[in-house]
């Protein structure tokens, strides 16, 4: 296991070192379980009480929390960001592939960049372009004329359909499907007529796509995922959706077709968003939101009924069903009061 001194960590993170810089760190742990040889972090002052019993060799914390800890410390403006950056330095996650496996099928005219690795039973079809240092896990399918940018990592059993473009330094988790048909049909006297989906999917650079997430290809134009977007597991992105830079989408979210989401948005888990609407930059939608109309102002938006006991919820649901009747009765009372005055 790699070791790094506290002084080296301070230098790489731009942190202020307090204590013995020669102490060696080999891993990161949560504050309550951290032991010798490990570093931990305090991201919120409300957890200061754990500092007194912390057994870690060092703690990343804010200057305001320093008086409450007398051990080795790295002082940072944002300890949680420090944790993220240090985790990257100490990352022990294996490669999704380490060489070109003999069982991989690679079309004769596919272009494979220097240092690329392709796992067992992966399929790289005609015209596909795999960039330098790309990792393609076992059992992946890369369709005709698909392009994967340099440094991207694709875990096992991912399907990337024909003509899809995946940018550089992307991460795609197992079971994701990029470029499958959008849900497009015409109706001919009660019978569904399939509309071939002639667009594709364009994914920018530094994008992360979670396990079992599906991103449909466009009907005519492309579905577009901009640079820096992070998408959690089990999300459905329908055809012709456009997602702006650095937007984050939590698990089980469903987006209908031709939705446009701006930059730097946060979409909570299990949110459902209607198609053919636009959400501006800087919008946060809390978990299980149901978005039926455009959002033109930045801010935090919520919908749904918070958790109650089943007994309370049944009463609330019964009252909700009577809102229209209650509204009519209220207007009638208001009218009578106005007439009497």
UniProtKB/Swiss-Prot annotation:
Entry's family note: Belongs to the transferase hexapeptide repeat family. LpxD subfamily.
Q: What is the lineage of its organism?
A: Bacteria, Pseudomonadati, Pseudomonadota, Gammaproteobacteria, Vibrionales
User: What EC number(s) are associated with this protein in UniProt?
Assistant: 2.3.1.191
According to the record's subunit comment, the protein's assembly and interactions are: Homotrimer.
Q: Which CDD domains match?
A: LbH_LpxD
Which reaction is catalysed here? Answer: a UDP-3-O-[(3R)-3-hydroxyacyl]-alpha-D-glucosamine + a (3R)-hydroxyacyl-[ACP] = a UDP-2-N,3-O-bis[(3R)-3-hydroxyacyl]-alpha-D-glucosamine + holo-[ACP] + H(+)
Pathway(s) served: Bacterial outer membrane biogenesis; LPS lipid A biosynthesis
Purpose of the protein: Catalyzes the N-acylation of UDP-3-O-acylglucosamine using 3-hydroxyacyl-ACP as the acyl donor. Is involved in the biosynthesis of lipid A, a phosphorylated glycolipid that anchors the lipopolysaccharide to the outer membrane of the cell.
Print the keywords alphabetically: Acyltransferase, Lipid A biosynthesis, Lipid biosynthesis, Lipid metabolism, Repeat, Transferase
Q: Name one GO biological process term.
A: lipid A biosynthetic process
Enzyme class, one word?
A: transferase
Task: List the Gene Ontology MF annotations in alphabetical order.
Answer: N-acyltransferase activity
Is the keyword Acetylation in the record? Answer: no
Active-site residues per Swiss-Prot or TrEMBL entry:
239 (proton acceptor)
**SUPFAM superfamilies, per this entry?**
Trimeric LpxA-like enzymes (SSF51161)
Entry GO terms, CC? membrane
What name goes with this protein?
A: UDP-3-O-acylglucosamine N-acyltransferase
């Amino acid at each position: 296991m790699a070791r790094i001194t506290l002084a080296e960590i301070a230098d790489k993170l731009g942190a202020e070192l307090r204590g013995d810089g020669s102490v060696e760190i080999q891993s990161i742990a949560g504050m309550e379980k951290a032991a010798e040889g490990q570093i931990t972090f305090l991201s919120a002052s409300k957890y200061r009480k754990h500092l007194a019993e912390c057994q870690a060799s060092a703690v990343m914390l804010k200057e305001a929390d320093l008086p409450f800890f007398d051990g080795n410390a790295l002082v940072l403006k944002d300890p949680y960001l420090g944790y993220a950056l240090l985790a990257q330095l100490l990352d022990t996650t294996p490669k999704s592939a380490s060489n070109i496996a003999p069982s991989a099928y690679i079309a004769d005219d596919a272009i494979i960049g220097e240092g690329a690795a392709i796992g067992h039973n992966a399929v790289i079809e005609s015209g596909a372009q795999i960039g330098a240092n790309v990792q393609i896990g076992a059992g992946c399918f890369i369709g005709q004329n698909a392009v994967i940018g340099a440094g991207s990592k694709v875990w096992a059993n991912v399907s990337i359909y024909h003509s899809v473009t995946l940018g550089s330094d992307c991460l795609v988790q197992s079971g994701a499907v990029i470029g499958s048909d959008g849900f497009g049909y015409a109706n001919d006297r009660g019978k569904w007529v399939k509309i071939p989906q002639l667009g594709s999917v364009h994914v920018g650079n530094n994008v992360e796509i979670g396990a079992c997430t599906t991103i449909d290809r466009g009907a005519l134009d492309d579905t577009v995922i901009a640079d820096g977007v992070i998408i959690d597991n089990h999300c459905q992105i329908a055809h012709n959706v456009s997602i702006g830079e650095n937007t984050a989408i939590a698990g089980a979210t469903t987006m209908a077709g031709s939705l446009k989401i701006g930059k730097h948005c946060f979409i909570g888990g299990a949110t459902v968003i209607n198609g053919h609407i636009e959400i501006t930059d800087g919008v946060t939608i809390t978990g299980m939101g149901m978005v039926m109309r455009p959002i033109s102002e930045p801010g935090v938006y919520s919908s749904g009924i918070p958790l109650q006991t089943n007994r309370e919820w049944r009463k609330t649901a019964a009252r909700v069903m009577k809102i229209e009747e209650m509204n009519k009765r209220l207007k009638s009372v208001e009218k009578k009061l106005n007439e009497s005055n």
